[in-house]
Amino acid sequence: NRKLLKTDHVIAISNYVRDLIISQHVEVENRLTVVHRGVDIDLFNPNNVNQTRIVNLVEGLAIPEDEPVIMLPARATKWKGHRILLQALAKIKDRPFICLMIGAGDGKPAFVSELVRYGQQLGLEGRFRLTPLVDDMPAALMVADVVAMPSITPEPFGRVALEAQAMGRPVVAFGHGGATESIRHGETGWLAIPNDVDSLAMA
């Protein structure tokens, strides 16, 4: 914080972060600029992902071809919202879907086991899968029908939302933090009431 006060200029990656800084250090307001994070639109471009890459991804993750794919690309940490997403999925389990939690399989074994048990308790056995990180994230996003970003605490911005939208995939997130700046509700995705399971399920 002291270093922040001594800088000539401060760059925030979102208006959310800007407001947070000003709430704690109003004296930097006049030397603070918002520069939103970007995305490599050559890498995350659906026109640059060939069918072979998609097939390899589908086969590697054994993704069913006849079910909609809900994807949560995030490391396995509690604030990323894996548990609340499982709760929301339990409310729509009468509908066909498979949920891929990309990256969650690399998490701490105790937390991964906890998520698996919790999903089973909710009656979601066989409906969700925790996988390691994938090398070809653009191809993975092409497989998704919708991308979930249910962080239970506000993201400063959230790169996943931009990458998914660049690939033409809608994003469902809670309406707080940087998500309110990167997602156009009803156009490029849906913003649910923060930490509301029913609202997330509806979205």
Sequence positions of predicted segments:
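Acidic donor-binding loop of glycosyltransferase active sites
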Residues: 142-156, 169
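Short hydrophobic beta-strand element within catalytic cores of glycosyltransferases
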Residues: 170-173, 183
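Short alpha-helical donor nucleotide-sugar binding micro-motif in glycosyltransferases
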Residues: 133-134, 140-144, 159
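Conserved acidic donor-binding segment of nucleotide-sugar-dependent glycosyltransferases
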Residues: 185-186, 190-197
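A short, active-site helix/loop in glycosyltransferases that binds the activated sugar's phosphate group
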Residues: 7-34, 39-43
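Short alpha-helical segment that forms part of, or immediately flanks, the ligand-binding pocket
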Residues: 138, 156, 161-166, 180-181, ...
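A conserved nucleotide-sugar
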Residues: 58-68, 82, 86-129
